[in-house]
């Protein structure tokens, strides 16, 4: 039976490495070619929206509300045109970010009203949600240090530390209240983090009959 697995976390949390570990673990269980997605993005139209969110426009500031609407527009395209069709075909989907990112970054970081965020989510997604979310938790200071070491920062990554602290608080709030979210301490050494991801995913796969 197809499943939708998402990897979440702040900048520098090691999501890319986590995704590799997830894909390798799934392959060991015979799930060799899952559909992989990223948000924002993942379709031609959604990638255009990603560029606006990540880079903005040189001649016009992107308002927080416009950013929020772009993110949900991109998500609607991806879910409707890629994720749901793949799941309907019986394929597994592994996503780099999903709605939890908006709840954390726009709801927590930007400070949008909780009711508005839930209304946006429910309007665009209804009862659709990932079967499993692996949240890579990291101290924002360490995460930003890692992100800076990778090179030039995008528009979101250039936000001040308190933005990411608020985003992390919201991430943890959801993670502590939703059994479908597994929290990994991403501030540890790479080997420990890798083992934690594999162990958690293996246990989840066994529990879910794979």
Curated annotation (Swiss-Prot):
UniProt key word Transport: no
EC number(s) stated in the UniProt entry for this protein: 2.7.4.9
SUPFAM superfamilies: P-loop containing nucleoside triphosphate hydrolases (SSF52540)
Pfam families with a match to the protein in the record: Thymidylate_kin
GO CC terms of this entry: cytosol
Gene Ontology MF annotations: ATP binding; dTMP kinase activity
GO terms (BP aspect): dTDP biosynthetic process; dTTP biosynthetic process; dUDP biosynthetic process
Binding, ATP: 9-16
Database matches in Gene3D superfamilies: P-loop containing nucleotide triphosphate hydrolases (3.40.50.300)
Catalytic activity: dTMP + ATP = dTDP + ADP
PANTHER family: THYMIDYLATE KINASE, UMP-CMP KINASE 2, MITOCHONDRIAL
Recorded family membership: Belongs to the thymidylate kinase family.
Entry protein name: Thymidylate kinase
Organism: Aliivibrio fischeri (strain ATCC 700601 / ES114)
Gene name in the database record: tmk
């Amino acid at each position: 039976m197809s499943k939708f697995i998402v990897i979440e976390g702040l900048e520098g949390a090691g999501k890319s490495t986590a995704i590799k570990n997830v894909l390798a673990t799934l392959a060991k269980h015979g799930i060799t070619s899952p559909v992989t997605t990223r948000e924002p993005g993942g379709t031609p139209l959604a990638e255009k929206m990603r560029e606006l969110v990540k880079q903005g426009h040189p001649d016009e500031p992107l308002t927080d509300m416009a950013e929020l609407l772009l993110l949900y527009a991109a998500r609607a395209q991806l879910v409707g045109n890629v994720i749901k069709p793949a799941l309907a075909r019986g394929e597994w989907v592994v996503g780099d970010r999903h709605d939890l990112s908006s709840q954390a970054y726009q709801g927590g970081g930007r400070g949008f009203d909780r009711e508005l965020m839930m209304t946006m989510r429910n309007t665009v997604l209804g009862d659709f949600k990932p079967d499993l979310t692996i949240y890579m938790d990291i101290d924002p200071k360490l995460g930003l240090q890692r992100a800076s070491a990778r090179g030039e920062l995008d528009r979101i990554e250039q936000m001040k530390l308190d933005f990411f602290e608020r985003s992390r608080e919201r991430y943890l709030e959801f993670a502590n209240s939703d059994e479908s979210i597994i929290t990994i301490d991403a501030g540890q050494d790479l080997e420990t983090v890798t083992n934690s991801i594999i162990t958690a995913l293996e246990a989840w796969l066994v529990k879910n009959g794979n």
